[in-house]
């Protein structure tokens, strides 16, 4: 059998039935074509014979007639033979063409044979196994017989065990006794050791207390020493400055005397010359006069020479005293430093002892409180407020000295004014050397303050300038301050940078106007008339062209290697992370594109014009001095706020600075009092005391402005008033030999901290590095009220600063547009409220603003970690205010620095900048960006963090930039310095060094949550649920409220959620619905639905991830049914349940995607819908919400108050949203029209009559129902859309169900149409008719609109087909006009648009096999076909094979029986349906033509 099946299989495989069928098809086609040709040729032959008969003579015809007749008979015989052969071929062809290929069946049969053979083998194997089992049974019986012996052996074993047990018990008793004795001994020893350790502990505690007291004493001694040291250094510095000023004045007097002596000598020579002339004219009478004049001139000259000698002695004496003072101060400084080192060493020892014995933080807090407590009484203050009494005391002490100070200042100005007037008379060529840019009285009092930072920028602080510097500038009427106006900080910085570029060239060119004086003090220099006259660019303009020309003319002759210069500049820019835009703006005065072009493709020197050479001159000057690069780097850091470390301090820094200014002024006055005699009268002193106070207040004001600019640029732009022009004037000198006297900057002295390394203070703003730690600890360590309490004297100064801060600063104006948001009156009010409220809060305003999402301790730790977070771009990124507590938070009060109205848009968040150390770690490594982004994406997905939050909190980028960077990361080598920063931040974030606040944290409870579902709220995901539909406000990322459910309930419901196939939810029945009249807590509280209850184990994202596959179509259908049945709107459902807008909900319900095509974020609304459907009280809660909304609307509608806010009810019911869109309540939303049921019914009836009503019908409906015409129009539009969507979803479902259950039998192969588009199925498009399994035709046709869906589910499976898509399927051959050229037995739908088309004839039974083909072909059922039947739509092309003709049906049934016999799957036969369909169409055409040719009678006889 197997051999027979195998040989059969091989035979049929070789036979290749399909190839044979193809060959038969080709032969049949050839035969059909030949028949047509033979018919034509026969006609031609007959016509030729007729013509031959007509044209030839009769005798010839008689001769040829027998031959022609024999030919005709032969042709007839041949044609008859060919017809019989064709008929025989046709019968064979008909039988063979539909024969299924038996190869698969034979193959299956062969496999079944193999299986049967294997069954036989298994049976024999079974027999063998049975035999072996019997043998084993026998062996088992033998083993049972041996059990008796085993029992005996067990009894013996039991006896042995009992003996062993008794022996073990005796041994155990002995051992127990021994152990008890040992234990008693050990317990005794332990007690002794415990006593000794307690005594030692007491001794250690005693020692610790003594050490702590010693440490405190040493700290206080060290503190006192530092203060003494600071006072002595400042006093010495003041003395040195006084001596220097005296020395310079003496020099000036000496020079004036020399000039007067020269003038006298000239007068003497001229007098001599005139005397000689006069002697010639009249000698005798004028001899006495000449003697007299000569003697008087000589006397005057001698007096002047004596005065010069006296002045020279004074100068020498002053220089000697100066050197002696220097030596004394140096020795004192060295002694103090030795003492300081000794104290530091003892302090280190004590700290090492204390390190292992006490908690560092506690000790630190105690020491800081002790420090603050000891500082107040040491300065003479007794009240709680440590700064205010000190200021008052200092002002009282200084009030008596201010009048003397003013008179001294007037005398100084008189002296310097006379010197200026005399100096003006001299020719400019007589002045020796380049002149300093400031007059001697304006020299700094403290040489420590005149030292510029190592980066080339200067302290932007009036604390470094003497008091008379400001007052002389303010009081001197000769200074042209009024003409300068307001100036840009950019231009000041540009001048500051340009100074070092051009100063050398200026000096070489002999220019007398230096931008900055770079050399040390000159002992013989004469003061310039005015500091502003010496700097031509002081008004904020760039250096004049003459200056740059003079700078360029120096190196005009030399050849410059442009490529090398460009390479060096690029290296320096990359090394210091300086952008080309900044470099071009400040150095070259060009745009970024021009700079990039110059650096990328530098032209050779000889090809450049004069103007083209100028950038290279500037670049060379830029590279010549390291200070230029450092200055530019500080500007870059200030503009970007990234790399340079920022020093932060609270507002107490400004008070400390004012205090130090007043102390310094006091000491200076004392020094001046002792050094110089008082030359002013009492009237002058009384008249000028007010001026002195005003100058001090103005100086304090400038100090505060500088402090604000340095320490809080993100909160308030720092205005620079006109008198501050001189701050950045060429006055602060670089390091000189005299700068070694003091090593402490003044702010560091006042804050009792040693200065840090110079690299730490690269900012150009006035902040010492030592401020950093003090500022960080200030909010937690200072006593309440001490941090921000403003002294009464200084409060008007601060108010004045606030009022003056509305000027448009080009530096900070583009950075902080949102901050200038309050009026001036509000600022002053806020300042007063802050002054009183700060005593309660105990922390500074900027810090309060930043403590939003974290607690106070977390905030302090965060800002300790980021000391440089304050930058021009740092805009307090955590300003997201949450829920009900928003109105009570202190940061909601208007900021004192915001001058206009608060804007609704929140401040753009920024990230804390990176430190240089973090840059250096990764900047020069090779980082694999692809792997890094992969890890970041994994971590984001694992923690459920959306890219928007990650970009805002970690990278400082938008969501689009983050998405682009994560999907297409560039290689590390192709990234610029700025482009590498996000990847460095990603690496730091992965390492846990950055942005730890971004990870999901548990939301904090804000209020009672009434009905909630037990799944977790992830605060970070809140803004990410519907980023397309919800406005991205800060409230969307606020922490979520927690549910008051117990944890056991939560865990229980969570486990149920996980176990159920579709997640269900338990509701908390604890709360009661709130009163509908409750207004929202605050004006700005968003009307967001209540989020899911917080639980630390499971979030909604995890619920989505764990959820099994949901039927999205089924869920949306059920939701729509529930909403429609209960007359609930999609807006209410979306806002309350899904947290989406009405448009998003409508789109979601109309076109739900399959579950497997949705992302995690896209699945979330469906999970929420499923949870809502599983809630038994879902409808009631939504109805409650709807009623409350309606009540609120009615209240608003009937209330006459114009400014009343909409009273939105608090959300009741289960809320499954996290990122709900906050609705701003100050905008009244247009009320939603709710129709009554009877109105809906009337509109539905009108719709059934006319889906597209005319305007007249609409107006009639509106008047009948008492509605607006717009409402009626909208209802018709919405209803049409709804029906269209329902039809669309049902068609999709019917298509999927029909494909799943399709069988291969011809009766079940009804054509399924492709789903139409949304508009096609409704608006006047005919539906294609589909064939039911019974062969009946059900024609569904929508008349001019979407019909009411009232059919049974079986009817709903019928799909619609657009009429415009139906295309004619061309025949294989034959004329297009043939109506009968198709399969005769095939069912056809009526043509479109013909109502009276004949119904198609059901399939007839197949005729007998022996019946003649001609008679079967001429059956009446096959004669005609309805017009248009040749057309087949796209649905037919894509569907299964329709019922074919009767002869083709019989062989088509055989494979189905074979399949049922051998168990082939039904889908196997359906695979080649399209091929079979094409083949059947071709076959029908050919067979019909052959049968027609075979059955045709010869119409014309032969002529012969």
UniProtKB/Swiss-Prot annotation:
Family annotation (Gene3D superfamilies): Homeodomain-like, lambda repressor-like DNA-binding domains
Cross-link (Glycyl lysine isopeptide (Lys-Gly) (interchain with G-Cter in SUMO2)), chain numbering: 772, 798, 829, 1268
Modification comment: Phosphorylated by PKA.
GO cellular component: cytoplasm; Golgi membrane; neuron projection; nucleus
Chain intervals with Low complexity compositional bias: 525-555, 759-770, 1034-1050, 1080-1093, 1302-1317, 1395-1457
Ranges of compositional bias, category Polar residues: 404-416, 447-458, 679-689, 842-857, 871-895, 1020-1033, 1051-1066
Main location: nucleus
DNA-binding region per Swiss-Prot/TrEMBL record: 551-638, 918-1005, 1101-1188, 1228-1287
Biased composition (Pro residues): 433-443
Site entry (Cleavage), positions: 734-742
GO molecular function: chromatin binding; DNA binding; DNA-binding transcription factor activity, RNA polymerase II-specific; protein-macromolecule adaptor activity; RNA polymerase II cis-regulatory region sequence-specific DNA binding; RNA polymerase II transcription regulatory region sequence-specific DNA binding; sequence-specific DNA binding; sequence-specific double-stranded DNA binding
BP GO terms, sorted: inner ear auditory receptor cell differentiation; kidney development; lung development; negative regulation of transcription by RNA polymerase II; positive regulation of dendrite morphogenesis; regulation of transcription by RNA polymerase II; retrograde transport, vesicle recycling within Golgi
Pfam families cross-referenced by the UniProt entry: CUT, CUX1_N, Homeodomain
Subcellular location: Nucleus
Chain residue ranges for the region called Disordered: 404-464, 520-557, 670-691, 759-912, 1020-1094, 1196-1231, 1296-1476
Annotated coiled-coil segments of the chain: 67-359
Family: Belongs to the CUT homeobox family.
Primary role: Transcription factor involved in the control of neuronal differentiation in the brain. Regulates dendrite development and branching, and dendritic spine formation in cortical layers II-III. Also involved in the control of synaptogenesis. In addition, it has probably a broad role in mammalian development as a repressor of developmentally regulated gene expression. May act by preventing binding of positively-activing CCAAT factors to promoters. Component of nf-munr repressor; binds to the matrix attachment regions (MARs) (5' and 3') of the immunoglobulin heavy chain enhancer.
Protein name as catalogued: Homeobox protein cut-like 1
Taxonomic placement: Eukaryota, Metazoa, Chordata, Craniata, Vertebrata
């Amino acid at each position: 059998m197997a051999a027979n099946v195998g040989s059969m299989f091989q035979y049929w495989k070789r036979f290749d039935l399909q190839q044979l069928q193809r060959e038969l098809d080709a032969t049949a086609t050839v035969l059909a074509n030949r028949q047509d040709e033979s018919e034509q040729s026969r006609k031609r032959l007959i016509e030729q014979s007729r013509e031959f008969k007509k044209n030839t003579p009769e005798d010839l015809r008689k001769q040829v007639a027998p031959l022609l007749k024999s030919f005709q008979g032969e042709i007839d015989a041949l044609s008859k033979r060919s017809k019989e052969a064709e008929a025989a071929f046709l019968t064979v062809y008909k039988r063979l063409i539909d024969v299924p290929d038996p190869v698969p069946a034979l193959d299956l049969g062969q496999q079944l044979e193999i299986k049967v053979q294997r069954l036989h083998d298994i049976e024999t194997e079974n027999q063998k196994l049975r035999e072996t089992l019997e043998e084993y049974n026998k062996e088992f019986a033998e083993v049972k017989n041996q059990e008796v012996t085993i029992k005996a052996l067990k009894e013996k074993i039991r006896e042995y065990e009992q003996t062993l047990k008794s022996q073990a018990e005796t041994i155990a008793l002995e051992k127990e006794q021994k152990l008890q004795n040992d234990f008693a001994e050990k317990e005794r020893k332990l007690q002794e050791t415990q006593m000794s350790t307690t005594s030692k502990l007491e001794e250690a505690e005693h020692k610790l207390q003594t050490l702590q007291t010693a440490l405190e004493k040493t700290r206080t001694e060290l503190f006192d020493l530092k203060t003494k040291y600071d006072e002595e250094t400042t006093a010495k510095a003041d003395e040195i400055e006084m001596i220097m000023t005296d020395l310079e004045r003496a020099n000036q007097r000496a020079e004036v005397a020399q000039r007067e002596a020269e003038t006298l000598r000239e007068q003497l020579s001229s007098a001599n010359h005139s005397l000689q002339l006069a002697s010639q004219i009249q000698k005798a009478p004028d001899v006495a006069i000449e003697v007299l004049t000569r003697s008087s001139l000589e006397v005057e000259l001698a007096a002047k020479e004596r005065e010069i000698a006296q002045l020279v002695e004074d100068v020498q004496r002053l220089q000697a005293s100066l050197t002696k003072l220097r030596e004394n101060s140096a020795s004192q400084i060295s002694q103090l430093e030795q003492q300081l080192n000794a104290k530091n060493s003892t302090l280190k020892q004590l700290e090492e002892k204390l390190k292992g014995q006490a908690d560092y933080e506690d000790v630190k807090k105690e020491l800081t409180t002790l420090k603050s407590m000891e500082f107040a009484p040491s300065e003479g203050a007794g009240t709680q407020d440590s700064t205010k009494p000190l200021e008052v005391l200092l002002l009282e002490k200084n009030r008596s000295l201010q009048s003397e100070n003013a008179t001294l200042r007037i005398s100084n100005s008189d002296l310097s004014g006379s010197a200026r007037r005399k100096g003006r008379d001299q020719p400019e060529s007589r002045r020796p050397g380049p002149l300093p840019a400031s007059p001697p009285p304006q020299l700094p009092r403290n040489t420590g303050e005149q030292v510029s930072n190592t980066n080339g920028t200067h302290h932007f602080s009036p604390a470094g300038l003497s008091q008379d510097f400001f007052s002389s500038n303010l009081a001197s009427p000769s200074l042209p301050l009024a003409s300068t106006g307001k100036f840009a900080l950019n231009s000041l910085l540009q001048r500051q940078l340009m100074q070092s570029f051009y100063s050398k060239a200026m000096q070489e060119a002999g220019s007398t106007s230096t931008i900055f004086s770079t050399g040390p003090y000159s002992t013989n220099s004469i003061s310039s008339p005015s500091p502003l006259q010496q700097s031509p660019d002081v008004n904020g303009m760039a250096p004049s062209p003459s200056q740059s020309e003079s700078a360029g003319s120096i190196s005009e002759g030399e050849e410059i290697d442009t490529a090398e210069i460009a390479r060096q500049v690029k290296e320096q820019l990359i090394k210091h992370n300086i952008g080309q835009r900044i470099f071009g703006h400040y150095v070259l005065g060009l745009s970024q594109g021009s700079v990039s072009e110059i650096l990328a493709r530098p032209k050779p020197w000889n090809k450049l014009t004069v103007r083209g050479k100028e950038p290279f001159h500037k670049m060379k000057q830029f590279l010549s001095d390291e200070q230029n690069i450092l200055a530019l780097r500080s500007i870059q850091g200030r503009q970007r706020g990234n790399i340079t470390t920022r020093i932060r301090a609270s507002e107490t820094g400004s008070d400390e600075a004012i205090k130090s200014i007043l102390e310094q002024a006091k000491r200076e006055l004392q020094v001046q009092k002792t050094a110089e005699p008082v030359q002013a009268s009492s009237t002058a002193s009384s008249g000028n005391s007010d001026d002195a106070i005003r100058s001090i207040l103005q100086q304090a004001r400038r100090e505060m402005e500088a402090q604000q600019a340095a320490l809080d640029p993100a909160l308030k732009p720092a205005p620079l008033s006109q008198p501050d022009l001189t701050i950045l004037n060429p006055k602060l000198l670089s390091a000189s030999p005299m700068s070694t006297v003091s090593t402490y900057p003044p702010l560091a002295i006042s804050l009792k901290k040693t200065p840090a390394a110079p690299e730490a203070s690269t900012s150009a703003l006035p902040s010492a590095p030592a401020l950093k730690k003090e500022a960080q600890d200030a909010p937690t360590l200072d006593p309440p009220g001490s941090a921000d309490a403003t002294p009464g004297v200084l409060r008007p100064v601060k108010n004045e600063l606030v009022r003056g801060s509305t000027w448009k600063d080009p530096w900070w104006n583009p950075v902080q547009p949102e901050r200038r948001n309050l009026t001036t009156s509000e600022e002053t009010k806020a300042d007063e409220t802050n002054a009183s409220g700060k005593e309660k809060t105990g922390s500074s305003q900027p810090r309060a603003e930043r403590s939003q999402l974290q607690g106070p301790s977390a905030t302090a730790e965060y800002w300790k970690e980021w000391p440089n977070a304050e930058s021009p771009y740092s805009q307090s990124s955590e300003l997201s205010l949450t829920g009900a507590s928003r109105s009570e938070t202190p940061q909601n009060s208007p900021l004192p620095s915001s001058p206009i109205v608060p804007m609704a848009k929140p401040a753009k968040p920024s990230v804390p900048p990176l430190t240089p150390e973090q840059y250096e770690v990764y900047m020069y490594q090779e980082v694999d960006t692809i792997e890094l982004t992969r890890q970041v994406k994994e971590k984001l997905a694992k923690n459920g963090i959306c890219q928007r939050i990650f970009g805002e909190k970690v990278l400082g980028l938008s969501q689009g930039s983050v998405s682009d960077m994560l999907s297409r990361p560039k290689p590390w080598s192709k990234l610029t310095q700025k482009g590498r920063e996000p990847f460095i931040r990603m690496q730091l974030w992965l390492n846990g060094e950055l942005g730890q606040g971004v990870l999901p944290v548990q939301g904090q409870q804000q209020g009672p949550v009434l009905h909630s579902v037990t799944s977790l709220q992830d605060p970070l995901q809140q803004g990410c649920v519907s980023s397309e539909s919800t406005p991205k406000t800060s409230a969307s990322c606020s922490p979520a409220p927690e549910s008051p459910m117990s944890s056991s309930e939560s865990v229980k419901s969570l486990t149920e959620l996980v176990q159920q196939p579709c997640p269900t939810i338990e509701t908390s029945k604890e709360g009661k619905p709130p009163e509908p009249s409750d207004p929202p807590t605050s004006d700005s509280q968003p009307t967001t639905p209540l989020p899911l209850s917080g639980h630390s184990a499971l979030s909604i994202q995890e619920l989505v991830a764990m959820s099994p596959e949901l039927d999205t179509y089924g869920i949306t259908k059920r939701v729509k049914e529930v909403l429609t049945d209960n007359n609930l709107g999609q807006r209410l459902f979306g806002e309350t349940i899904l947290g989406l807008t009405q448009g998003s909900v409508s789109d979601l319900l109309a076109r739900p995607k399959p579950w497997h095509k949705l992302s995690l974020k896209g699945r979330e609304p469906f999970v929420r819908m499923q949870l809502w459907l599983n809630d038994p009280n879902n409808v009631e809660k939504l109805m409650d919400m709807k009623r409350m909304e309606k009540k609120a609307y009615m209240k608003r509608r009937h209330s006459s108050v114009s400014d009343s806010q909409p009273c939105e009810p608090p959300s009741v019911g289960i809320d499954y949203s996290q990122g709900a869109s906050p609705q701003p309540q100050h905008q009244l939303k247009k009320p939603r029209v709710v129709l009554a049921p009877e109105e809906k019914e009337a509109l539905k009836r009108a719709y059934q009559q006319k889906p597209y009503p005319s305007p007249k019908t609409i107006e009639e409906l509106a008047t009948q129902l008492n509605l607006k015409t717009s409402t009626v129009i909208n209802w018709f539009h919405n209803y049409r859309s709804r029906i269209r969507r329902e039809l669309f979803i049902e068609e999709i479902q019917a298509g999927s169900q029909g494909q799943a259950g399709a069988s291969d039998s011809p009766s079940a192969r009804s054509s399924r149409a492709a789903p139409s588009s949304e508009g096609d199925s409704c608006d006047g498009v005919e539906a294609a008719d589909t064939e039911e399994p019974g062969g009946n035709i059900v024609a569904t046709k929508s008349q001019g609109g979407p019909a009411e869906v009232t059919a049974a589910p079986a009817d709903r499976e019928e799909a619609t087909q657009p009429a415009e898509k139906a295309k004619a399927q061309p025949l294989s051959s034959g004329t297009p006009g043939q109506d009968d050229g198709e399969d005769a037995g095939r069912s056809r739908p009526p043509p479109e648009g013909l109502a009276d088309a004949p119904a198609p004839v059901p399939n007839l039974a197949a005729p007998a096999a022996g019946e003649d083909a001609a008679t079967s072909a001429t059956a009446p059922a096959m004669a005609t076909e309805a017009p248009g039947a040749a057309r087949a739509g796209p649905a037919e092309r894509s569907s299964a094979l329709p019922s074919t003709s009767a002869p083709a049906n019989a062989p088509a049934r055989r494979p189905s029986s074979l399949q049922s016999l051998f168990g082939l799957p039904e889908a196997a036969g359906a695979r080649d349906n399209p091929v079979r369909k094409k083949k059947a169409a071709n076959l029908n055409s050919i067979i019909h033509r052959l049968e027609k040719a075979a059955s045709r009678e010869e119409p014309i006889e032969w002529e012969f």
